[in-house]
């Protein structure tokens, strides 16, 4: 008994020590001791019953207290859960993800996510705090209005809650019920007997002291088992939070990579569109030039066709004129030849006619001379003198008058021949 009292495991000394600690706060309670362990330094703001010792409530119940947010199943959601349940991602007032921009609220949510899971809800319905060993001396009770504005609604534990079932083991409860001693208020850890206790209970206290020490050991063992399980759960939760954080960082890195690739692709597409626009404008201008050139070419072809037709017509007219010229030249040459022949024939006929005329005139003159000689012979002594040059007198037919007569005669002959 004395050994147990010296170790603080139970008995009157242990009960007195716990009572003294609860009333005056002179020593550290088991919950505060667990909170101050080095391996649980992340739980510096919370006690064993999930009570926040750093909470400072004012009169303003509507103010935003992001530092008091507790880690729960809905804090620190990743994009997979948002996509699965079609939830909107968290964005700040600038329109960007608050976690990427280092928002204080998101950092607090990540810090709360790395904290261990709560055993009981943060906001109990009762006004009395569950931490009996030191919380009552340093905090004040919250009103019903403050409790109603809590972020996480209170969910009462189910009948088959594993923690409560492990803590309040049914076999142990049945064993206590089957024991000759009834379970009173003073047997519950954290609760102490009323000063108005009955005398028989005080007399029987020493008898039940050994059983109480045994129960305290069992309760302490259950506490430590729960604490160890909480520590393992916290470590698993930290690992899970670390994985979630890494996945989120990887997701944001991928998102930045995709965003950069999208920006590059968008810039490239804009450049291609500008080049396509310039190419289309150049193509349109070339098309207009092609149409104008084609129109000019069509006009040129039509003019060339007209020119070819005119040239062909001129060639035909030239050939016709050349033929006419050749024909006229041939006719002219024929006429010239004919004229030459006629001229030669005319000259020959004139010579013939002149010779005949000359002969006829000669004969006529001879006849005249013969007549004159005949008459002269009869009158040889006549006074008239015989002219021996009959061709030179005025009556001779071979004078100028005779020449004119011959010329007219020849003209008449030429006209007769031409006819």
Swiss-Prot record:
N-terminal signal peptide: none
GO cellular component labels: cytoplasm; spindle pole body
Compartments (UniProt record): Cytoplasm, Cytoskeleton, Microtubule organizing center, Spindle pole body
Bias (Low complexity) ranges: 64-75
Pfam families: BBP1_C, BBP1_N
Function field: Component of the spindle pole body (SPB) required for insertion of the nascent SPB into the nuclear envelope and for the proper execution of spindle pole body (SPB) duplication. Connects the central plaque of the SPB with the half-bridge. Required for proper localization of CDC5 at the SPB and for proper M-phase progression.
Name the record gives this protein: Spindle pole component BBP1
Lineage: Eukaryota, Fungi, Dikarya, Ascomycota, Saccharomycotina
Gene designation: BBP1
